[in-house]
């Protein structure tokens, strides 16, 4: 991805975050003039934002804001933010941390070949020291090899991505389903076996549409707020 293309997307996202839903963007020609880039670069950037669900286009009318960047990224569940909104103190305990080869199924999720290495870790998420969520996560080892257990316990994962690696999340795919806890999850959270829970499957992508996080979360149904 060219630096001009990447920078234009960042600049457009900044402007879109200030616009109202349904607002019309300047014409392609105006964007070319404003950002000093070619029409090809403008079209590629707009196409990316359309495919990401941030903009939509109407033939003969132009390009419009479907949802501001801030709104779009706040639609996914953030345990840290939600816990603070509820007036509680969030905390993460790293229960396990390992660097290993991804399984065939995991390689398929990341669209990588056999031998692909991941950092695999399990976290217990607490609110005022009460266990609320059990999470297992995978991130690419070669890209984030300096991440360790201590760093994961010190600040949110997405803050690590952005502040330590300059990797901003631009697209998140989540799937929610009602489930029941396994014996291991229930025991860790001091709950009865097969306690009801909300299962969250999350895939997080960067600007280049590379998958940089695959997480499965199990949230206790009796205290979970979203």
Model feature map: region roles:
Residues 1-39, 85:
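Extreme N-terminal segment that seeds HTH/winged-HTH DNA-binding domains in transcriptional regulators
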Residues 21-24, 55, 131:
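Conserved hydrophobic residue
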Residues 28, 74-88:
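Short glycine- and basic-residue-enriched patches
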Residues 45:
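Residues in the recognition helix of alpha-helical DNA-binding motifs
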Residues 53-60, 66:
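Beta-hairpin "wing" of winged helix-turn-helix
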Residues 90-226:
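C-terminal all-alpha effector/ligand-binding and dimerization domain
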């Amino acid at each position: 991805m060219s630096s001009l293309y990447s920078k234009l997307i960042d600049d457009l996202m900044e402007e879109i975050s200030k616009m109202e839903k349904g607002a019309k963007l300047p014409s392609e020609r105006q964007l070319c003039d404003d950002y000093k880039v070619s029409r090809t670069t403008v079209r590629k950037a707009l196409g990316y934002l359309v495919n990401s669900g941030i903009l939509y286009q109407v033939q003969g009318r132009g390009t419009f804001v479907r949802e501001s960047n801030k709104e779009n990224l706040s639609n996914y569940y953030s345990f840290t933010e939600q816990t603070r909104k509820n007036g509680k103190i969030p905390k993460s305990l790293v229960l396990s941390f390992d660097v290993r080869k991804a399984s065939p199924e995991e390689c398929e999720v990341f669209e990588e070949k056999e031998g692909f290495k991941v950092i695999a870790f399990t976290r217990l998420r607490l609110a005022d020291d009460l266990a609320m969520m059990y999470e297992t996560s995978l991130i690419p080892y070669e890209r984030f090899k300096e991440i360790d257990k201590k760093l994961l316990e010190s600040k949110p994962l997405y803050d690590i991505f952005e502040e330590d690696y300059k990797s901003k999340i631009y697209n998140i795919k989540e799937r929610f389903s009602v489930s029941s806890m396994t014996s291991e999850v229930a025991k860790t959270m001091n709950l009865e076996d097969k306690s009801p829970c909300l299962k969250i499957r999350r895939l997080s992508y960067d600007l280049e549409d590379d998958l940089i996080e695959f997480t499965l979360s199990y949230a206790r149904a009796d205290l979970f707020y979203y």
